[in-house]
Structure formats: C-alpha cells, structure tokens
C-alpha cells in the first residue's frame, strides 16, 4: 500500500498562482487554514459545533487541522493552539535522520549499539528491549521502523542521540518553515503534559503542515519520502484512533502520540481515500485533569467528522 500524489486542482492553482506545487498547499504560517470557498462557511461552523460537543462529551481540549491536497479545501479547530506532542515526534526524528544523518547513505545500514540501561530508562521498548537487539544492536533502518511503526521509546531516544538531542527536532522543523513545533526533552520526560507548558509541544496546524511537507511535499528526497511513508503506513498503534474512525479502504500514513498524564491522545498524518487526493489530517487532544483517561475514541470521532466534511 502506498500514497499517490495527485496534482493540485485548477481552482487551487488559480488561488495560489501559477507554478503552485503540492508543497505550496502547505504554507509555513501558523494561522489556521481557512476554507477556500465562502459557500462552505456554514459547513465549517457546523463542524466546529460538533467538535465542541465532542470536547464537552470527553471533558477535553481538542485541536484539528485538515487539508484536501487536491482541492485546497480545509477545516480547522483550535489549529493554532499548543498541545503536547508526545510520540508524534518520532516520525519527525526519522525524517530528520533520513535527510541529515543519512545524507551519505550509510546510516540506515549501520549497526547501532546501545546499553540495556539506555533503552530501559526510556520506558516502552517492545523492539529495542529484546535481548537479541540489546546484544547485537540494530541498524539505523530498524531503529527508524521501531520508532515510527511500533512507537518504541528507546528507538526514539537513539534517533535523538544521532540528532544531537531533542533540540535537533526543533531545528529540523524550523528548516521546514514550522516555527511552532519544538522538542526539549527525551523519552519519557517529554510526555508530561502540564497545562500551559510550551516545551515539547506543537499545534494541529503546524504539525499537520509539517507532515504534509514530508509525506506529499518536497521536503525529503523521493527515496527518503518513500521510506518514511512506508514506516508510517506500517503503523501498529493507530487502530483505536485514525484506523477506528476512517474507512477500512483508506491508506493511512500516520503517527500517534499519547501519555498517561492529562489523557493526551494524538494522531497526525496523511490519509488517502480511494481515487482521491490525499488529506493532511492532525487531531490533538488533552484533558484538564492530570489523571484524566486517554480517550482514543475522541480522536477517532474527530477524524471521522472532519474527513467526512472534505470527502
């Protein structure tokens, strides 16, 4: 399974000007994307009301950004507000490694060795914690796959180590025109999701555009874009979020993120209905109670609502 990239629609080209590309549909600005047609304003207001109802139902704060890359139509809700990022960063780490660390095409095949303590300190380690991997190490490609497809915290930290720490993610995002997304700490500390925390956060609009640039834009070389997309399509953690909310025949290239504090539940990526251009979709959520439960159905329902509006 793979994503196919359709050219921008004629209407979008006219709106953006001659020479517009898929990357042009994903502007760097932090403002929430607005629908390109005033005729769709009532629909946009309707979707906002339904998203507010979901917030009330789940006692949560919800942020959504969606963009149809074929038509330029979009929907957003709290798209400029900051939310904890959690494990969503792992896709950015893999992308940064592909672009910057593997520039000479050596890292993916290089065997990376690490100590048992290094990965155990990270928490969730379904792949890096295996005895055979601790003993023999893992290749760069295996670490990327473990971080993105399995959300392995140890693999995420090992990729951060290659990027000279969490601030490497921030620098990478700035190089893409994303002035909002930032990472400051390692796993598992980065998952503390206190209200008003700025560190280790992003916004639905910023992270959505960044994923769009990476997956259907030109931020990565074609081969690297294909590798990253493959790891995202192989995601094993999205069954209760995007996979639960979107039709079974849609291709999903997404990364989840969640935490035990403040009930964080996130999913971000590019999704493709059959026969249509891809949709950029980000859904971020958090609770007001530090012991609030993680409600993946909230993410699934929000994704279904906005995707339904655009298709």
Swiss-Prot record:
Substrate binds at residues 255-257. The class A beta-lactamase family has a specific amino-acid numbering system, sometimes called Ambler or ABL numbering and often misspelt as Amber. A multiple sequence alignment was used to derive a consensus sequence and then the consensus was numbered taking into account insertions and deletions. This allows use of identical numbers, e.g. for active site residues, despite differences in protein length. UniProt always uses natural numbering of residues, hence there appear to be differences in numbering between this entry and some papers. It is an enzyme of class 3 (hydrolase). GO terms for molecular function: beta-lactamase activity. Disulfide bonds: none annotated. It holds the Pfam family Beta-lactamase2. GO terms for biological process: beta-lactam antibiotic catabolic process; response to antibiotic. It catalyses: a beta-lactam + H2O = a substituted beta-amino acid. InterPro entries: Beta-lactam/transpept-like, Beta-lactam_cat, Beta-lactam_class-A, Beta-lactam_class-A_AS, TAT_signal. Predicted to be exported by the Tat system. The position of the signal peptide cleavage has not been experimentally proven. This is Beta-lactamase. It comes from Kitasatospora aureofaciens. Keywords: Antibiotic resistance, Hydrolase, Signal. PANTHER family: BETA-LACTAMASE, BETA-LACTAMASE-TYPE TRANSPEPTIDASE FOLD CONTAINING PROTEIN. Residues 1-34 form the signal peptide. Belongs to the class-A beta-lactamase family. The active site is at 87 (acyl-ester intermediate). Its EC number is 3.5.2.6.
């Amino acid at each position: 399974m793979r994503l196919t990239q359709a050219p921008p629609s004629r209407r979008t080209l006219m709106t953006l000007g001659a020479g517009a590309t898929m990357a042009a549909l994903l502007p760097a600005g932090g403002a929430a994307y607005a629908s390109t047609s005033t005729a769709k304003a009532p629909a946009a207001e309707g979707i906002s009301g339904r998203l507010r109802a979901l917030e009330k139902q789940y006692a949560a704060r919800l942020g959504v950004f969606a963009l149809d890359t074929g038509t330029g139509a979009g929907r957003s809700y709290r798209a400029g507000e900051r939310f904890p990022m959690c494990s969503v960063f792992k896709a950015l780490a893999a992308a940064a490694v592909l672009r910057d660390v593997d520039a000479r095409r050596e890292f993916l095949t290089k065997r990376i060795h690490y100590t048992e303590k290094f990965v155990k300190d990270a928490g969730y380690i379904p792949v890096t914690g295996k005895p055979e991997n601790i003993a023999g190490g893992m290749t760069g490609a295996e670490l990327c796959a473990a971080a993105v497809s399995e959300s392995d915290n140890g693999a995420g930290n090992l990729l951060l180590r290659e990027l000279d720490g969490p601030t490497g993610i921030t620098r990478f995002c700035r190089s893409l025109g994303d002035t909002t997304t930032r990472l400051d700490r390692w796993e598992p500390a980065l998952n503390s999701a206190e209200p008003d925390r700025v560190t280790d956060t992003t916004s639905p609009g910023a992270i959505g555009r960044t994923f769009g640039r990476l997956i259907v834009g030109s931020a990565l070389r074609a081969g690297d874009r294909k590798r990253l997309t493959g790891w995202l399509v192989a995601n094993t953690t999205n069954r209760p979020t995007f996979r639960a909310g979107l039709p079974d025949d849609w291709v999903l290239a997404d990364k989840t993120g969640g935490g035990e504090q403040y009930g964080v539940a996130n999913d971000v990526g590019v999704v493709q209905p059959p026969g249509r251009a891809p949709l950029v979709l980000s859904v971020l959520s958090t609770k007001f109670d530090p012991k609030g439960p993680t409600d993946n159905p909230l993410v699934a329902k929000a994704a279904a609502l906005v995707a339904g509006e655009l298709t």
